[in-house]
Regions:
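Phosphate-group recognition and catalysis centered on beta-loop-alpha active-site segments
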Residues: 1-331
């Protein structure tokens, strides 16, 4: 399974309807939709609540007084935050490319697309599914769960309501809920029948563990016992790709860990993140040059992960990833 990570952000500004539509038309059946809440209780597709880096909000003088500093999961962040805007206000903004140094061509599309609500993404998914005669789905991700609970604007009840309203509260739904936190997924497992995916990072610990003084880290979640615990509430594991195949001291691809085998033994499917074609994101020996916007040999990287037994992965260039998949399957 290839999941369009934030749509197809190798080609269009991330998390826009244009990015999702392109991903589906390229051939993936799934897109990853990060969700954060608005002031009026809507869910919008953004990677984090701070929108200065992915929209033109700084050019809107009417919102200048909304700029503030927030401590987000222990990190001090200054900017503009979705929870301080209504959906209607967010709709007056336009998306811009997050990493123009790596994706200068995407700046062509700056200012063309609005911020999308999750409902709009679901509507697009349904419409394109009918047109393309395929079952298309989303991987909604609850971002910064503990933070939004702490300010009284939790994402989870809103997500549950949207899933139910759209007939997605079922085990075979074309939706898979993701989170880097644990307690919210355990709670969601009791509330909905939609499948769950536990995300893990190569470093650090889940924000809910840190907030509660739980000393466990992401490394503890991916031990054989940790994976058995995850499998009690989740069907999928979404590790950092470095947890599947770490880089060596020269930043080249190393040897696969036992993670895939251990996760499969626990009954989990493994879908790591994130595959990107541009040089800075690739292992050193697969880079074509020092140019930050040039492509390197991502096919070799992706082939190594298929050989390691993963069940799919998240990719910024879905067309490239699908080509890797077809090569692996011998099509």
């Amino acid at each position: 399974v290839i999941i369009g990570h934030r749509g197809a952000p190798g080609y269009r500004p991330e998390h826009t309807l244009a990015s999702y539509e392109l991903a589906f038309r390229m051939g993936v059946d799934w897109v990853d939709v990060d969700l954060v809440p608005t002031k009026d209780g809507q869910l919008v597709a953004r990677h984090e609540p701070e929108i200065g880096g992915t929209t033109d909000v700084a050019k809107h003088p009417e919102f200048a007084n909304r700029k503030k500093t927030v401590v987000l999961d222990g990190v001090t962040t200054t900017g503009w935050f979705t929870q301080d805007f209504t959906l209607a206000e967010l709709k007056t903004l336009r998306a811009v490319e997050r990493i123009p140094q790596n994706r200068p061509h995407n700046t062509l599309y700056n200012g063309r697309y609005r911020i999308a609500s999750y409902q709009e993404v679901l509507d697009l998914t349904t419409r394109l599914g009918r047109e393309l005669h395929r079952t298309l789905g989303t991987y909604p991700e609850v971002k910064h769960s503990t933070f939004f609970q702490s300010i009284g604007n939790p994402t989870e009840p809103k997500l549950v309501a949207i899933l139910r309203r759209n007939g997605l509260d079922r085990p075979d739904a074309p939706a898979i809920i993701q989170s880097f936190e644990v307690s919210n997924l355990i709670a969601l497992h009791q509330q909905v029948r939609t499948p769950l995916l536990q995300l893990t990072s190569a470093t650090g610990a889940p924000a809910d563990f840190v907030a509660k003084g739980d000393k466990r880290t992401y490394a503890d979640l991916v031990t054989p016992q940790g994976l058995r615990d995850v499998a009690k509430y989740a069907k999928y594991l979404g590790p950092d790709k470095a947890q599947v195949i770490p880089r060596d001291k020269n930043d080249n691809l190393g040897t696969p860990t036992a993670l895939v085998a251990d996760a499969h033994k626990a009954g989990l499917k493994v879908q790591p993140y994130t595959f990107r074609n541009e040089n800075p994101f690739l292992p050193a020996n697969l880079r074509s040059s020092a140019e930050p916007d040039a492509y390197g040999d991502v096919f070799t990287e992706e082939a190594a992960f298929f050989a390691a037994g993963v069940d799919g992965f998240f990719a910024d260039q879905p067309d490239t990833a699908l080509e890797s998949l077809h090569a692996f399957l011998g099509r």
